[in-house]
């Protein structure tokens, strides 16, 4: 099994995760549009379009896990999330890597009961529907 961890995104969550993994002795590849990310001897930073599955596979032919820590601008979710999510899912399926997603609760929409995983995905807005579709496809 590969010890490589692919972290996509270098915001607060992605950078912190990459540093934690690297400090634990893991090999980490951080992929962003610009090639940014934390500096560490166990971290390799790469600039790439993560919606391109073939590029992800070229960068990391195998991995223990791929971590989705990206978030396109809200006004571009409907256009940008579907190909990114499909690429991550395809990567996990082809490599056997675990797909870990840093997400939010938008897919559920407004609720007036305690939130649990069994709540239906009833998002009324575009972004919530995009998020719900990503979850549905990843199940």
Question: Which residues fall in each region the model found?
Answer:
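Conserved N-terminal Rossmann-fold NAD(P)-binding element of oxidoreductases
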Residues: 5-9
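Cofactor-binding loop segments of dinucleotide-utilizing enzymes, especially the Rossmann-like FAD-
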Residues: 10, 33
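Hydrophobic/small residue at the entry helix of a nucleotide-binding pocket
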Residues: 13
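Aromatic pocket-lining residues of Rossmann-like dinucleotide-binding sites
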Residues: 21
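Conserved dinucleotide-binding and phosphotransfer motif residues
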Residues: 24
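Conserved Rossmann-fold NAD(P)-dependent oxidoreductase catalytic core, especially the SDR/UDP-sugar
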Residues: 27-29, 86-135
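NAD(P)H-binding glycine-rich loop region in Rossmannoid oxidoreductase-like domains
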Residues: 36-95, 108
């Amino acid at each position: 099994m590969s010890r490589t961890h692919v972290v996509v995104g270098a915001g607060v969550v992605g950078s912190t995760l990459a540093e934690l993994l690297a400090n634990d002795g893991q090999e980490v590849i951080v992929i962003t549009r610009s090639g940014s990310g934390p500096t560490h001897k166990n971290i390799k930073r790469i600039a790439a379009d993560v919606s391109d599955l073939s590029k992800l596979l070229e960068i990391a032919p195998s991995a223990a896990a791929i971590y989705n820590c990206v978030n396109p601008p809200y006004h571009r979710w409907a256009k940008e999330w579907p190909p990114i999510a499909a690429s991550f899912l395809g990567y996990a399926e082809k490599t056997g890597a675990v797909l870990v997603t840093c997400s939010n609760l938008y897919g559920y929409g407004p609720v007036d009961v305690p939130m649990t995983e069994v709540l239906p995905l009833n998002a009324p807005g575009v972004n919530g529907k995009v998020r719900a579709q990503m979850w549905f496809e990843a199940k």
